[in-house]
Amino acid sequence: MKLDVFAGQEISELSMIEVARAILEERGRDNDMYFSDLVNEIQNYLGKSDADIRYALPFFYTDLNTDGSFIPLGENKWGLRSWYAIDEIDEEIITLEDEEDGAPKRKKKRVNAFMDGDEDAIDYSADDPEDEDFVRESSDIEYDEEDPDDEKSEVESYDSELNEIIPEDDFEEVDLNEEDEEDEDEEE
């Protein structure tokens, strides 16, 4: 493969990002690439060994994400941001997300590495409530609605308990006028 953009430049001095941009520009808008295919073409162009590519791969992926000229198109496909208008980018991202919503999600079974086949051991991760897809039906839901009749019966029961302690006959009647006279005497 030959890239005209780098004519006259030393191939060993080129970065993987520069080569990726040139490869995508040469292929054009209708030919977005999977990440693995892009890395393979970069490796072939730069003539790097598998070990060198494996070492540089995390750095390249980080650069690909942070460089503003690349855009992820979903399903691990990449393209150049200059290929898409701003409105078109949002639409493509939204349509990719909408397509994923229709697929049912499968629950993966967790394996506890520490269980080691011991049948008597208790697996505490098995009772995690966040793992359950339990939805309570509306008929199962009970509400604590206050009933005014309950309040009346509570007051009556409270009164009856008080009467057991102090019978009503023992209550002393208080005349409010007497208290007022006593207050007047104290003021003088």
Curated annotation (Swiss-Prot):
Annotated GO biological process: DNA-templated transcription; regulation of DNA-templated transcription
GO CC annotation: DNA-directed RNA polymerase complex
Domain HTH HARE-type: from-to ranges: 14-83
Keywords from the named record: DNA-directed RNA polymerase, Nucleotidyltransferase, Transcription, Transferase
Pfam families for this protein: HARE-HTH
Keyword field contains Transferase: yes
Entry-linked HAMAP family: RNApol_bact_RpoE
Subunit description: RNAP is composed of a core of 2 alpha, a beta and a beta' subunits. The core is associated with a delta subunit and one of several sigma factors.
Family of the protein in this entry: Belongs to the RpoE family.
Protein name according to UniProt: Probable DNA-directed RNA polymerase subunit delta
